[in-house]
């Protein structure tokens, strides 16, 4: 039995709609019983405490179809809707439909600085002190990261890959990451590296994410670094298969010097990580 005098984690009888909202509340160690996400691959692995009900796109098509029966079945106290300002992917747009059905709704605005949103999340649950504690810890981590960043040689060439694992099929799908993606921008801006995947005519169903195709064009640019994000094992398997078929690329700087790194997947909803 847990210590009743330790206030966190708080497991609330609520449903959270929106990946960023779930992330900010999770940073405060406040969790719900249900989650509707859709922006972050494999969100169910990042938030195992919350039952995944559907994706945000499906929710916006009909806000009450899945959420309303779930809320009534679990007797949810209220629903937290993320307000992100998006014209076509904004969970807060479902507020009116839910309130018409008698479901209590609270809004968490995730626009603005990370510190500002953490304070909003803390205020929503009466946990202002916890929010300030998390902000202090984050500031300390960023200061430590700044020391690391200063030690990295600028201008290194990087090949960046993403593997997304399907929770249904248990299969992984590997992609290239282009300079358009938030993940690439975070890595290149933070560490002053260059993403060498530049294919302006490549099809992108999701901005910044491209089909793997033949990797020769990447390895011919002799990358200094190879970065695996998401399911790193799946990324490694694909690049290893390619190098076995094209052994000349084993001499590229990244492979020869063992400069192959795993990094978390990143998009705006994961700013806190």
Label every model-predicted segment.
Residues 94-171, 259-273:
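Extracytoplasmic substrate-binding proteins
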Residues 65-76, 124, 212-222:
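Short helices/loops that flank or line small-molecule/ion binding pockets
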Residues 39-45, 172-208:
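Alpha-helical, coiled-coil/dimerization segments enriched in small aliphatic residues
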Residues 20-23, 38-41, 84-88, 111-114, ...:
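Solvent-exposed loop/turn segments at secondary-structure junctions
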Residues 13-74, 78-87:
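A short, structured surface patch at a secondary-structure boundary
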Residues 196, 203-231:
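Ligand-binding pocket segment of bilobal, Venus flytrap-like solute-binding proteins
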Residues 220-221, 228-273:
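Structured C-terminal subdomain patch of bacterial secreted/periplasmic proteins
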Residues 1-11:
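N-terminal hydrophobic or amphipathic helices and topogenic motifs
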């Amino acid at each position: 039995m847990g210590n009743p005098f330790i206030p966190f984690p708080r497991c609330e009888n609520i449903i959270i709609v929106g990946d960023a909202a779930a992330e900010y509340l999770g940073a405060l160690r406040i969790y719900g019983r249900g989650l509707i996400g859709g922006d972050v691959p494999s969100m169910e692995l990042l938030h195992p405490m919350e039952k995944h009900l559907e994706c945000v796109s499906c929710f916006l098509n009909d806000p009450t179809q899945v959420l309303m029966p779930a809320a009534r079945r679990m007797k949810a106290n209220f629903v937290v809707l993320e307000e992100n300002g998006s014209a076509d992917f904004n969970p807060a747009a479902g507020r009116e439909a839910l309130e018409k059905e008698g479901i209590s709704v609270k809004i968490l605005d995730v626009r603005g600085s990370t510190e500002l949103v953490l304070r909003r999340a803390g205020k929503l649950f009466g946990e202002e002190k916890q929010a300030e504690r998390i902000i202090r810890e984050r500031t300390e981590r960023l200061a430590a990261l700044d020391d690391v960043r200063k030690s990295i040689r600028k201008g290194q060439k990087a090949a960046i890959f993403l593997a997304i694992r399907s929770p249904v099929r248990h299969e992984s799908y590997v992609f290239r990451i282009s300079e358009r993606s938030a993940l690439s921008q975070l890595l290149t801006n933070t560490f002053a590296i260059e993403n060498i995947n530049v294919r302006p005519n490549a099809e992108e169903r999701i901005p910044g994410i491209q089909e793997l195709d033949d990797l020769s064009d990447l390895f011919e640019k002799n990358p200094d670094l190879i970065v695996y994000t998401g399911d790193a094992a799946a990324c490694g398997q694909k690049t290893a298969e390619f190098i076995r078929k094209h052994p000349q690329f084993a001499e590229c700087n990244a492979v020869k010097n063992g400069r192959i790194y795993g990094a978390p997947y990143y998009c705006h909803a994961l700013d806190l990580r």
